[in-house]
Regions:
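Predominantly soluble domains enriched in secretory-pathway, periplasmic, or organellar proteins
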Residues: 8, 18, 43-510
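N-terminal secretory signal peptides
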Residues: 1-23, 28, 37
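Signal peptide processing junction and immediate N-terminal pro/mature segment
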Residues: 31-47
Length: 510
């Protein structure tokens, strides 16, 4: 943290102050021949790294990395496996794409996996254009399976936003072995897994709202469209149940007790145009009550649509399986802290993160408190907060897309500040390069978060690498978070478009 940040001056304020001071001082100097105040020469803190931190990230020839990193390939449709901390690419796992090197998407065996769970509508569409399978995919959110809140090394689950699919990769052989196309939903985006007692369910957010069933009716009345929250059985790779919700679902995450899943949501207005979708300054999160959902399925309170058991979880529903809690407009990332107690909602359009207490949802569902009373902190962190990861020591690391920074802050101090105590929860802001999206730390999404490394996935590299023409590589930056201060130690050029990554200790895989 720079002197200016300690004194409460951020980069944007410094720039404005510097320009003003330099202009005024220059004018005074011309008029009186006096010395000008060179405030503009005092630059904000940059993400400098030193030799000691660089050496920690070096893996000599013949030596092995400590961690596996699983990178989503975005529109390439593949998973990229890296070693950490070296950031060396080890292999690529084709999933939603075709691969001439391995034959994936070409051989009968792979086509069987890719096509076995396509919906009838997709099969008919592919037949009409003379294709055996989809040739593309938008692979997001690689998530390893859990047992009791820790990675168990069995599977990696990934979603396809382009064609509404979920795929499973066996981690013992690093190959895709199952795939399912999810009916009724459209554009699977948010993907997180059941942490307790095990995975269990893969929870999938259908982001875009469509008529259900989508058979060419209700096209002119968007109020009758819905997003769909789906639970896929991770063992059978079949849709277990679905919940229709109000608004557009974005990202989700599950607790560490097997009781609740929360999802960010935008377009509470349920409009179609940008003006309609952003008319309100509030949106909401949706909290799903897993035991209540499973009981409703047992009691037969579902409707079967396109072969799936579908429950009504909209605001008007009387089933008691969801609650809607207002938050600032268009929340994005949804991240469960390793302490098992807290849930972080990242504001995106709001410069804030909102902290919920998982156990307070018991009273919200019981009607004892309002949803807003489950909020225990609300902290201003910077512009464009998208995602948060954790070090297991009570600290959070939030990506700031517009500021191109990672901000380190403390949960307990944020809660104390929310109660009115004079404490500054923000510990450091680190420049990254540039426009960071996802961020993830070593085991940061488990109860075993170890606080060693974090990876910042930056959308633009700009001037960080040799020029290769108009399509620049993206930039995956390795950050040492083991000490009191974050230190940038590596720039990794990456072909478009890694969307997210998770990091697993090598000892977890067989």
């Amino acid at each position: 943290m720079s002197k200016f940040e300690k004194d409460g001056v951020n980069r944007r304020e410094l720039l404005g102050t510097s320009l003003t001071a330099a202009t005024l001082a220059g004018t005074a100097g011309l008029a009186a021949g006096g010395a000008t105040i060179m405030v503009a020469n005092q630059a904000p803190a940059h993400a400098e790294s030193d030799d000691d931190h660089h050496k920690k990230a070096m893996v000599p020839p013949g030596k092995l990395d400590e961690y596996y990193g699983f990178w989503s390939g975005g529109h390439s449709g593949e998973v990229r496996v890296l070693g950490l901390p070296s950031m060396r690419e080890l292999i690529r796992i084709p999933v939603f794409n075709r691969c001439s090197a391995s034959g994936w998407g070409i051989t009968n065996e792979s086509l069987q996996i890719i096509n076995e769970s396509l919906t009838p509508e997709s099969r008919a569409y592919l037949d009409s254009i003379g294709q055996k399978a989809y040739l593309n995919g938008d692979l997001h959110h690689p998530r390893p399976s859990y047992t009791d809140g820790a990675y168990d090394g069995r599977y990696l689950f990934v979603n396809d936003k382009a064609n509404t699919r979920l795929a499973r990769i066996r981690l013992d052989v690093m190959k895709c072995d199952k795939m399912v196309q999810i009916p009724n939903a459209h554009s699977i985006h948010g993907l997180r897994l059941q942490r307790y007692p095990r995975t269990g369910y893969a929870f999938c957010n259908g982001e875009n709202r469509t008529p259900i069933p989508n058979v060419g009716k209700m096209l002119d009345d968007s109020k009758k469209w819905s997003s769909v929250f789906s639970a896929v059985d991770g063992d059978t790779m079949q849709v277990a149940w679905q919940v229709i919700v109000s608004g557009n679902l974005d990202n989700n995450d599950a607790d560490y007790k097997g009781k609740y899943i929360a999802s960010t949501s935008y377009n509470a207005e349920e409009g179609r145009t940008v003006a309609e979708m952003t008319a309100s300054d509030k949106d909401h999160i949706v909290v799903f009550n897993l035991p209540a959902i499973e009981q409703a399925i047992k009691d037969g309170k579902f409707e079967t649509i396109n072969g799936a058991k579908v429950l009504d979880g909209r605001k008007s529903s009387k089933l008691g399986i969801t609650v809607y809690i207002p938050v600032a407009n268009s929340p994005h990332g949804c991240n469960a802290a390793p302490d098992g107690k807290h849930l972080i909602i990242n504001g995106k359009l709001s410069p804030t993160v909102t902290v919920f207490a998982w156990d307070k949802f018991d009273d919200v569902f019981a009607g004892k408190i309002k949803g807003e009373e489950a909020i225990v902190a609300n902290l201003e962190v910077g512009l464009g907060p998208l995602h948060t990861t954790f070090d297991g020591k009570g600290n959070c690391y939030t990506s700031l897309f517009l500021d191109s920074q990672v901000v380190k802050w403390n949960i307990d101090e944020a809660i104390r500040a929310y109660k009115g105590e004079k404490v500054n929860p923000i510990k450091q802001k680190l420049d990254v390069h540039y426009q960071i999206g996802h961020i993830n730390a070593t085991h940061g999404e488990t109860k075993e978060a170890d606080g060693k490394w974090a990876v910042a996935l930056c959308k633009f590299s700009k001037d960080r690498f040799l020029n290769v023409g108009p399509m620049k590589p993206e930039n995956d930056q390795l950050i040492d978070i083991s000490g009191d201060k974050m230190v940038l130690v590596h720039d990794g050029p990456t072909y478009a478009e890694p969307h997210d990554a998770t990091i697993v200790h090598a000892s977890k895989l067989n």
